[in-house]
């Protein structure tokens, strides 16, 4: 029986006349339908109750009615505003200005007498920081042609390697084109408009694409070195992925990153096959930080670390949606452990005391036990046919199982201070991929998406190293891309 096949009044009277057994059977069918509808309503209400602060949904999905956020940060004791020692960005006068413009005093403000011939006794100074008028500089390269006085052969000098065309743009100009198109996500046509507005230089869309492709090709050796280094580094490696529409199909951009390096790669798959294609996770033996997506755990040679930011959001959801007291208490405990680790680090300690670890582990297990008592396993319906696989569980039970089975990954930050509490590093490194998708909607070709990932890996790494993005792109387009210090030949040989 379905909701569209409910009995009519005539059918109900007929059932009543058939006797008690017929009525009981009809009620059992209706009860089964009600339970199914209740489960469906619960799933739909759960979806509506989720937002950016209690799930992995992005803030852009919240709409105009922002949810009331639960503050997860604890008071730091710091005053509001800039902190002592903060460098600031105050505009300050310089000792040697580029140009001085003198404003003469012509008449006395008191008696109106002429001051044209009066002696200047001093100056009140004010400085204006302004852009000069910018125009493209055209550099003509001339290769000498000389006949040989001995044999008469005509000889022509060689042009520099970077001067390969009769007319072309230089690396600094192309760096700005790539900067606007790839870093600030301006579409091709708007990038062309910007170059006209800034330099009065019309630019075709093909030139923008060609500049980006050239930059991607030039930074390939850097990205290859980054990828190899991330496999071997002793630092915790952050992993994540996000969906991207490419050539009318769903693809995935995978990130592997540290605080100093970023590597992005496009793949048509999300899970284990993508990790095998990329080749970082299968060879990784150190810490890997990620969410609870099961495909990550298929590679057991790595030391897995679970992102607790995801756990906090799920615990908030369970407490708000189902009033699960244990969820709020476990959230508080995780934040308490995090605070204890930070306090110990500030005190110069390298680990928590054994008594602290034992106490936190005991309280963690006690809250899991409390959660299991509040969320017993589902009771199979004897009237329903058996299905393959595990019976469907509640969201609370699923989270409890993950927190229990992967407790070492959840609490890894407590055992080793090198391990971060969350996977925010990878999420930050993927954020610009989503911004690019918001601006452009999709990539029409795989080659365009791969170009974006290659350039984004390079400029994200350069930014982490404190290098100007424009300077990094100029170096790449000039044929000498920037290599981070950790990837220099001397550093690699020492390692």
Predicted feature descriptions by range:
Residues 1-168, 234, 239:
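Short, flexible loop/hinge motifs at secondary-structure junctions
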């Amino acid at each position: 029986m379905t909701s569209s096949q409910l009995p009519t009044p005539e059918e109900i009277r007929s059932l009543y006349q058939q006797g008690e057994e017929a009525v009981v059977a009809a009620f059992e069918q209706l009860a089964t339908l009600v339970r199914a509808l209740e489960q469906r309503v619960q799933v739909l209400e759960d979806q509506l109750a989720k937002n950016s602060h209690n799930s992995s949904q992005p803030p852009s999905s919240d709409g105009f009615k922002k949810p009331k956020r639960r503050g997860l940060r604890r008071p730091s004791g710091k005053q509001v505003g800039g902190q002592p020692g903060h460098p600031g960005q105050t505009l300050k006068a310089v000792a040697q200005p580029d140009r001085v413009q003198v404003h003469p005093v012509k008449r006395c403000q008191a008696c109106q007498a002429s001051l044209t011939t009066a002696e200047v006794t001093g100056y009140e100074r004010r400085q204006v920081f302004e852009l000069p008028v910018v125009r493209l500089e055209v550099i003509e390269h001339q290769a000498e042609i000389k006949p040989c006085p001995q044999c008469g052969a005509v000889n022509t000098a060689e042009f520099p390697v970077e001067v390969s065309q009769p007319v072309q743009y230089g690396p600094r100009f192309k760096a700005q084109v790539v900067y606007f198109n790839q870093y600030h996500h301006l579409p091709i046509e708007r990038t062309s408009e910007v170059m006209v507005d800034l330099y009065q230089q019309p630019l075709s869309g093909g030139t923008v694409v060609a500049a980006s492709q050239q930059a991607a090709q030039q930074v390939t050796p850097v990205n290859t070195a980054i990828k190899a280094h991330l496999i071997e580094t002793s630092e915790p490696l952050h992993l994540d992925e996000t969906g991207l529409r490419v050539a009318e199909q769903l693809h995935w951009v995978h990130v592997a990153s540290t605080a100093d390096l970023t590597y992005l790669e496009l793949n048509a798959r999300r899970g284990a096959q993508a990790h095998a294609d990329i080749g970082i996770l299968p060879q990784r033996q150190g810490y890997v930080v990620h969410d609870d997506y099961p495909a990550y755990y298929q590679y057991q040679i790595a030391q897995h670390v679970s992102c607790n930011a995801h756990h906090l959001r799920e615990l908030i959801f369970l407490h708000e949606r189902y009033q699960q007291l244990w969820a709020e208490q476990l959230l508080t405990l995780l934040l308490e452990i995090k605070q204890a680790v930070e306090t110990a680090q500030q005190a110069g300690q390298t680990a928590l005391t054994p008594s602290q670890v034992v106490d936190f582990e005991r309280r963690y297990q006690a809250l899991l036990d409390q959660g299991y008592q509040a969320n017993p396993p589902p009771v199979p319906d004897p009237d329903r046919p058996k299905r393959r696989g595990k019976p469907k569980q509640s969201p609370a039970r699923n989270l409890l199982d993950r927190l229990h089975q992967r407790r070492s990954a959840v609490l890894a930050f407590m055992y080793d201070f090198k391990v971060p509490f969350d996977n925010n590093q990878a999420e930050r490194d993927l954020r610009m991929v989503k911004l690019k998708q918001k601006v452009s909607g999709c990539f029409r070709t795989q080659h365009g998406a791969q170009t974006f990932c290659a350039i984004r890996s390079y400029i994200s790494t350069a930014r982490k190293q404190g290098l100007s993005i424009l300077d990094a792109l100029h170096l790449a387009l000039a044929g000498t891309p920037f290599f981070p210090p950790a990837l220099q030949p001397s550093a690699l040989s020492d390692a």
